């Protein structure tokens, strides 16, 4: 009986080559099945973080312009939202928000140039285009950065504001689009939403998203300490 027990122990001791190969194959199959899920999860986390950074950039820019810590964009859109032809009622409000939101997306030259001084973070700020940089990684604003954010900003101006610059600063619409800085690394046009298609990047996606599309788009009303109710009424066709 003692001899038989020893033989049984020796017979079951260790793994055979076939068992080891089967274990390797099973582990390989499991890794192959799990790898896409891991990659998708990491991609979604990265994209969600980018959308969060872009939202913060948009909020900080709007707050900075509203408090006048950031210079207002010089890219202006003429909006005459008063129907001066209709007489019932006179000066009826004529919304032109679609015209405002149809401002063209930036066209990249493939080499984004921004100042390195913190006092003037605008890459460009003129009557045709206003681009403001948020240097997220601290290495200077560059189209090679995967973390920096570029804000395209534009504001409305009324016909009266063209005649009197001080009136234009009393209240206006501010449009903001936030793009990834690496969207400007290629000499192609960026994209934007229109009245039929929303093009902003989703927080959850099967990849890293369309880097040419805006991360965030928003429109808000800007008023200052000089803004009065009369200014808003004049711009919108009067108050009842």
Annotate each predicted stretch with a short phrase.
Residues 34, 49-55, 59-240:
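Flexible, low-complexity segments enriched in proline/glycine/serine and punctuated by aromatic residues
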Residues 1-15:
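N-terminal leader/signal peptides at the extreme start of proteins
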Residues 15-61:
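Aliphatic-rich helix starts adjacent to a transmembrane/signal segment
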């Amino acid at each position: 009986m003692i001899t038989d027990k020893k033989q049984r122990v020796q017979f079951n001791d260790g793994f055979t080559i076939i068992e080891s190969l089967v274990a390797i194959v099973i582990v390989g199959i499991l890794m192959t099945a799990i790898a896409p899920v891991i990659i998708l999860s990491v991609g979604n986390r990265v994209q969600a973080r980018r959308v969060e950074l872009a939202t913060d950039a948009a909020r900080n820019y709007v707050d900075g312009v509203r408090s006048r810590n950031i210079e207002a964009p010089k890219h202006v859109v003429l909006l005459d939202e008063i129907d001066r032809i209709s007489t019932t009622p006179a000066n009826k409000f004529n919304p032109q928000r679609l015209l405002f939101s149809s401002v063209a997306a930036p066209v990249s030259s493939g080499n984004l140039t921004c100042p390195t001084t913190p006092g003037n973070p605008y890459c460009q700020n003129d009557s045709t285009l206003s681009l403001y940089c948020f240097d997220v990684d601290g290495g200077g604003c560059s189209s090679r950065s995967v973390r920096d954010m570029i804000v395209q900003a534009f504001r409305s101006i009324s016909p009266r504001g063209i005649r009197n610059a001080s009136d234009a600063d009393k209240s206006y619409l501010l449009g903001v689009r936030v793009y990834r800085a690496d969207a400007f690394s290629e000499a192609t046009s960026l994209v934007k939403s229109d009245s039929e298609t929303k093009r902003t990047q989703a927080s959850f996606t099967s990849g890293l998203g369309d880097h040419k599309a805006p991360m965030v788009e928003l429109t808000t009303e800007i008023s200052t300490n000089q803004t009065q109710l009369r200014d808003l009424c004049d711009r919108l066709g009067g108050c009842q």
